[in-house]
Amino acid sequence: MSNNGVDIQDKPPAPPMRNTSTMIGAGSKDTGTLNHGSKPLPPNPEEKKKKDRFYRSILPGDKTNKKREKERPEISLPSDFEHTIHVGFDAVTGEFTGMPEQWARLLQTSNITKSEQKKNPQAVLDVLEFYNSKKTSNSKKYMSFTDKSAEDYNSSNTLNVKTVSETPAVPPVSEDDEDDDDDATPPPVIAPRPEHTKSVYTRSVIEPLPVTPTRDVATSPISPTENNTTPPDALTRNTEKQKKKPKMSDEEILEKLRSIVSVGDPKKKYTPFEKIGQGASGTVYTAMDVATGQEVAIKQMNLQQQPKKELIINEILVMRENKNPNIVNYLDSYLVGDELWVVMEYLAGGSLTDVVTETCMDEGQIAAVCRECLQALEFLHSNQVIHRDIKSDNILLGMDGSVKLTDFGFCAQITPEQSKRSTMVGTPYWMAPEVVTRKAYGPKVDIWSLGIMAIEMIEGEPPYLNENPLRALYLIATNGTPELQNPEKLSAIFRDFLQCCLEMDVEKRGSAKELLQHQFLKIAKPLSSLTPLMHAAKEATKNNH
């Protein structure tokens, strides 16, 4: 029996699909019944307030806002200040004292149990401070071809646990608590999980940390007092002075860009332009290089609308200097009027995220992806570059099965003098424990994230994605290596590979170079074995819309 001359029996079997798709169509009736824990990080309440203020200011007839703006005096930013918050923890009652109200509300809805809080109050404060930092502003990873947002935490904080003999006072008002309605704002509601569920919709975050973070934990026996009350441990948060690099002016940024970009008219070099995406930081098109016939992706960004233009320069320079077969390579860039055009390789297979959420990968296919990613990481690490945001969304696939690492918005260049970074960067569910616990770190944070991504390929999502985001951070900080749902289904060499990636002790964790010699990679299938998975994922995605 044949169909258009092709024997049906000769067709390869369809790739195995996940029984329960982790994508939910826009019209699905079940979207409202999702476990709230399986949703992305909540929207930034500060951002909502900014939008509300903006809309009020442009509403017709609202003259009070304009009048208030005129009357408001100009106040310069504070400088050379030190801000201390004292938070106590009563080991007997298991309660925090002196905790800022906003933190207390978040903790109340975090699903972190009382016993967990009592077990590790320091970790609770670490994740609260990270999650709820007041000084937030949006930043973008400009070269990525999906619209991702980032929260930029500009605090410089250390948390120290010390034993004191008296109940600490209520913390002083933070210098950035300008709005009186802050305390009235309820804790952010965790938004419904989007129809494409995946890491592309979870936020990446960046938070500068102190150059020399201190974490002194002093424990002493607690004796009951006459009133049978126990002096709480004080958890002290010190905001220290931090030297900041002077910001580049718009003119300096333009001057630097002019020295980087090519001269000429890209509209003559590339044609035709087909729009494939629109994001807050720009519009993405595909086009053909007239001279070579190569299909490319072109991102057009209006520079006036970019809040952190210096990040664009950093990203272009890193991509330009680090070309590799396993990296989505930067090809060219142009200044066209007020726009910056960045030309990149185009991979039609989409991101690995679609494959892991819609299909079931076997160990040979997972090994092939891990090998290609490790080759990219070995190259970057040997050039003193840490990617810092490894996850399935940042792995792009070609229809031939090629696997390439992309999105260098948060990459870091390290020097021999600065072999460790101390910045909280990445996407929370993929973060290494040393990042969540605010320690200095090195290139092996990428190896941990690769291990989490391998779990994505097994289970369709990273560990703790179904947990409240705050509790997920707590679990990463305290549990360390996550447990697999069905470890018995994996081969011994795959389990060993995962253990090498997800080793809590950074010194024992494998490097990219070492892991490329691991036995697990020897079972890798040809890259062409990924092509049927991409076709199946695209078909499933189409059916879910």
Swiss-Prot record:
InterPro entries: CRIB_dom, CRIB_dom_sf, Kinase-like_dom_sf, PAK3-like, PAK_BD, Prot_kinase_dom, Protein_kinase_ATP_BS, Ser/Thr_kinase_AS. It catalyses: L-seryl-[protein] + ATP = O-phospho-L-seryl-[protein] + ADP + H(+); L-threonyl-[protein] + ATP = O-phospho-L-threonyl-[protein] + ADP + H(+). Residues 152-166, 220-231 have a biased composition (Polar residues). Transmembrane segments: none annotated. Its EC number is 2.7.11.1. Its cofactor is Mg(2+). Phosphorylation of Thr-84 by OXSR1 inhibits activation. Activated by binding small G proteins. Binding of GTP-bound CDC42 or RAC1 to the autoregulatory region releases monomers from the autoinhibited dimer, and enables activation by phosphorylation of Thr-423. It comes from the Eukaryota. The active site is at D389. Residues 70-140 are annotated as: Autoregulatory region. GO terms for biological process: actin cytoskeleton organization; amygdala development; apoptotic process; branching morphogenesis of an epithelial tube; cell migration; chromatin remodeling; dendrite development; dendritic spine development. Residues 75-105 are annotated as: GTPase-binding. Residues 270-521 form the Protein kinase domain. The modification N-acetylserine is found at S2. Belongs to the protein kinase superfamily. STE Ser/Thr protein kinase family. STE20 subfamily. This is Serine/threonine-protein kinase PAK 1.
